[in-house]
Structure formats: structure tokens, C-alpha cells
């Protein structure tokens, strides 16, 4: 945040959350993503067994360790899009929660529009209504912390 302040003065924060993320992961899309990186048929067989051992057609079980790995693999697609196609340098994600720091409100609105489109068309995901754009002065709640340019504070549980 300090880098953004030094570079731009005032800036905007785009905070995003994916709606019902684990429930909405498309296993077919996930498998295609994995198949682009892994070519070994035995490993792919094992991955398919793990994925489809869960009886659900769509979505992953939250408590399963492999689900956490698969969920990160799935969202790596949006990571790459944001960093390399949109060229947004200040982007941070933990599972389905992410924050982006952008120079202007217009930049934030435009980025949000493109990200929504990419998520819907490529990953069949939508952003939660909690998604918001706000000025840097407020700081941001992220991963259990209240973060601003001067400090990092553990957030109260009620907030």
C-alpha cells in the first residue's frame, strides 16, 4: 500500500470475493486446466479418481485437502489473466478473496468489468455481492487483518 501511495498519491482498492466458490467449481474445466500442465496418464487417472470420488457433478468438498489444491489451480487462471493480460501489478489473492490496488476509480471499474466477464466466460464463476471499490484511506480488511499503509492489525472477529 505504501508503494501505491508513493507512486500515485491517492488510489482505489478493488476487493473481490467469488460467490459460493467451492460449490461452483466446474470439474470439467478444472480437469482441462490440469491436463494442459500434466501429461502423465497415470497421474491424470489418479486426479480424475479423486475429483469424481466426490459424487457431486459440480463443486468441491470444502474440508478435503485436495479440494484446496484444486481450488488454487482453478483460480490460477484468473491470476494469470489479471497479471499478464490486464497488467495489474498490485494484485493479491488468498483462495477466493482478492484485492487489487488501482490508480483511479475508473481503472478499478474497468478492471472489475473485465474480470467479471473472464470469470463468467472461462471459469463459470461470479463475484459475490460483497465485491466493492473504495478509496485507499479506508484501508482494507483482508484475510483476518485490517491493512492500511501504516500498519497491519488483527481484525476484531465481529467485523
Where are these regions (language model features)?
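Catalytic Cys-His active-site segments of thiol-dependent hydrolases/isopeptidases
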Residues: 120
Amino acid at each position: 500500500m505504501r508503494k501505491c501511495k508513493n507512486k500515485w498519491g491517492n488510489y482505489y482498492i478493488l476487493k473481490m470475493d467469488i460467490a459460493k466458490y467451492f460449490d461452483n467449481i466446474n470439474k470439467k474445466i478444472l480437469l482441462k486446466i490440469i491436463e494442459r500442465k500434466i501429461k502423465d496418464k497415470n497421474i491424470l487417472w489418479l486426479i480424475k479418481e479423486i475429483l469424481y470420488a466426490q459424487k457431486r457433478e459440480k463443486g468441491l468438498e470444502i474440508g478435503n485437502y485436495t479440494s484446496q489444491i484444486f481450488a488454487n489451480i482453478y483460480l490460477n487462471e484468473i491470476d494469470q489473466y489479471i497479471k499478464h493480460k490486464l497488467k495489474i501489478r498490485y494484485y493479491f489473492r488468498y483462495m477466493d478473496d482478492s484485492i487489487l490496488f488501482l490508480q483511479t476509480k475508473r481503472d478499478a471499474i474497468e478492471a472489475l468489468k473485465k474480470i467479471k466477464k473472464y470469470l463468467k466466460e472461462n471459469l463459470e464463476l461470479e463475484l459475490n455481492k460483497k465485491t466493492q471499490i473504495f478509496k485507499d484511506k479506508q484501508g482494507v480488511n483482508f484475510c483476518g487483518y485490517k491493512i492500511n499503509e501504516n500498519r497491519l492489525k488483527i481484525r476484531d472477529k465481529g467485523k
